[in-house]
Amino acid sequence: MQQQYNPSAIEPKVQQFWAENKVFKAVKDVTKEKYYCLSMLPYPSGKLHMGHVRNYTIGDVVSRYQRMIGKNVLQPMGWDAFGLPAEGAAVKNNTAPAKWTYENIEYMKGQLKMLGFSYDWDREVTTCRPEYYKWEQWFFTELYKKGLVYKKTSTVNWCPNDATVLANEQVHEGCCWRCDTPVEQREIPQWFIKITDYAEELLTHLDNLPQWPDQVKTMQRNWIGRSEGVEITFKIAGSNAELPVYTTRPDTFFGVSYVAIAAAHPLAEMAAENNPALAEFIREAKNTKVAEAELATMEKKGMATGLFAIHPLTGKEVPVWVANFVLMHYGTGAVMAVPAHDERDFEFAQKYGLQINQVIQPLDGSEWDFSKAAYTEHGKLINSAEFDDLNFEQAFNAIADKLESMKVGKRQVNFRLRDWGVSRQRYWGAPIPMMTTEDGEVVTVPMQDLPVILPEDVVMNGVQSPIKADPEWAKTTYNGKPALKETDTFDTFMESSWYYARYTCPQYHEGMLDSDEANYWLPVDQYIGGIEHATMHLLYFRFFHKLLRDAGILNSDEPATKLLCQGMVLADAFYYTSPTNERIWVSPTQVTLERDEKGRIIKATDPEGRELVHSGMTKMSKSKNNGIDPQEMVEKYGADTVRLFMMFASPAEMTLEWQESGVEGAKRFLGRVWNLVYEYSQNPATAALDVAALSKAQKELRRDVHKTIAKVSDDIGRRQTFNTAIAAIMELMNKLTKAPLENEQDKAVMAEALSAVVRMLYPITPHICFELWQALGNNDTIDFAPWVVADESAMVEDEKLVVVQVNGKVRGKVTVSATATEDEVKAIAKADANVAKFLEGVEIVKEIYVPYKMLSFAVKA
């Protein structure tokens, strides 16, 4: 063992040993309890960032710990390799997306290996490889045959200049990112998977996931958005047309003063035929793409159609308006508006001078000022004919009953969740395995013709997908007759919805999954990834698992038992303002800092001497140029130090502030561990530990060791508070550094302690522990060493400290035997000099004893 800790000399050597010996290869073994630990797979963007490092370090700590406690651990890694960024990079670098992607994968794989993660690389999955997406295509054709896939028109962003579809992120302030042409909304046919068929189960099964964060479950519940209400049909005056609306508040039905419909509603189109102003308003509204999140805050705009709807219960006519806050793909594309009791309807009514009819009164009978706001709470009905005085529940049922009896309404459960649109008009994705025959019949690509391979040697022009631009690519035959292949590709969420299952059998070629392998390893025991995936990936991932179950491939209901959402990584951000008033962000690695006595930044300058503005700690990002390159940090400090800092600086689910001073502190701590093992290894124990022969000080030190083992085991295994586990090891190290090594039992206690420290640190800092384990004289590698177990008998204290109070004030502390009786404790306390002087010449009127904790005397003169 070298005297000095030098990570760059150790880490590559240890990593080579792991690779050559396939130490982390996972093999099904029904005699052992399995443990499947998975971090969300990365997009191969070119370089790892600190967010990746944090996610994967957490996963690796969990995996190594579970392996040490005797479980059969699977920890795989792969690449979510399709996606839009590759197309942009290919155009920019004049290369093909595939070439760019594969080069990035190789580079990033090297970075992952450099960090020492214990992956089974034989299970690596790359989602853009035909052997992977072949089975995704096959499964899609199976879903189509089951009636779970359909095609319908849907709105997309269309650039008329480039004649191409744009992804949302390619639309900048309503214009095309490439040519600045105003973007239009266009209806085109797209493929959908019926996730709505599973809405109820996706919702109710959230209750079966006690080890998922409540925040994620709440976000999914809201996204699925189950509501109970009534669908009501209004007739249109002077025509046979009908207008269905859905409401969750039938109690407000008598307050309807207008009906609002979406710009794309058939009635709106009909009304616009002879109304050029309305036609123009509709065109403008259709071309303003609105994210649902913006609906509440955006300016409400509308126009009267000239049509009137007949209220089914009062017979009164109410105007029909086109409004920009109603979306065609939500519910029926129409809403009954009750301005008195809905904030959005109220804003719109105030703007356009529409009637506001109060029909709900606060339960306490108080007056409400309708000039200021709508009253949106439940209450008591007024101005509602025979339904007056009913509360919400009574009115809901009574009005629903009446509408149903009149055949103009029906109770209905609705979901906010929409079917999953999986068509993308991009090139770099898996081709959708459908084709159209010359007589217009839409059919699936037969199994023997799968995969439909995406050509990889293409030239990107930055405008159109190469498979759309090449008329030859789509040409095929079906039953000997000409047909055309679909040129759209899958949404990349398709690949990431089932990769976790493919890891269980990546070399299996007889089908999508080997059910024996998949059902042995699944569900995932621990899944780790960011909370930003709560309503997209994590919902599709659950949905796909249920589809695979219903296809008879899997036998579990949910894909992952436990979910941990790691916090973001933040770093200081600095900028100066250019002469053109633009913020120029300077990397923290280029900044010279001055701090005050409390460590706060008081001055920051760049290499040119410019004074910079410190904008605080923000998420590491390219836009603020405050990302820290993990590779630079590993080269400077070592992988173990980076890993230790990542796990220690903050609880796993909270944000982590990157501080290089903290990284330096982590390196110093590992240096102290190294030095202590080195010092011990120069003069190791020759006698075995003899518990009976230990001195009081030796017993105390040994007690601290075993208490730390118990705490660290609980913190890593059950609580997942990795930072407190590390803090406990650091505290123990402080005691060990001060412990004497004067006799054989000193050394024997130290040998046991160091063996424990090295094993407890191993999941977090595996390279240094690999070396230290050998230095402690162990023949086998630490990779196969069992986790250290606390000795209960060592934690039993021989002595207890009892606090002694006289008339409520602490007057002394006495040490007593852990087996002392109450009378013995009282005698020792009364004999203590500090206590005795307060008991002299007084009468003890009461004694209260809390065993081995406190003794209290009440006295009077």
From Swiss-Prot:
InterPro entries: aa-tRNA-synth_I_CS (IPR001412), aa-tRNA-synth_Ia (IPR002300), Leu-tRNA-ligase (IPR002302), Leu_tRNA-synth_edit (IPR025709), M/V/L/I-tRNA-synth_anticd-bd (IPR013155), Methionyl/Leucyl_tRNA_Synth (IPR015413), Rossmann-like_a/b/a_fold (IPR014729), tRNAsynth_Ia_anticodon-bd (IPR009080). This is Leucine--tRNA ligase. The keyword ATP-binding applies. It is an enzyme of class 6 (ligase). Its EC number is 6.1.1.4. Keywords: Aminoacyl-tRNA synthetase, ATP-binding, Cytoplasm, Ligase, Nucleotide-binding, Protein biosynthesis. A motif ('KMSKS' region) lies at residues 619-623. NCBIfam families: leuS_bact. It is found in: Cytoplasm. A motif ('HIGH' region) lies at residues 42-52. It comes from Actinobacillus pleuropneumoniae serotype 5b (strain L20). The gene is leuS. One of its GO terms (molecular function) is aminoacyl-tRNA deacylase activity. The keyword Signal does not apply. Belongs to the class-I aminoacyl-tRNA synthetase family. It catalyses: tRNA(Leu) + L-leucine + ATP = L-leucyl-tRNA(Leu) + AMP + diphosphate. GO terms for cellular component: cytosol. ATP binds at residue 622.
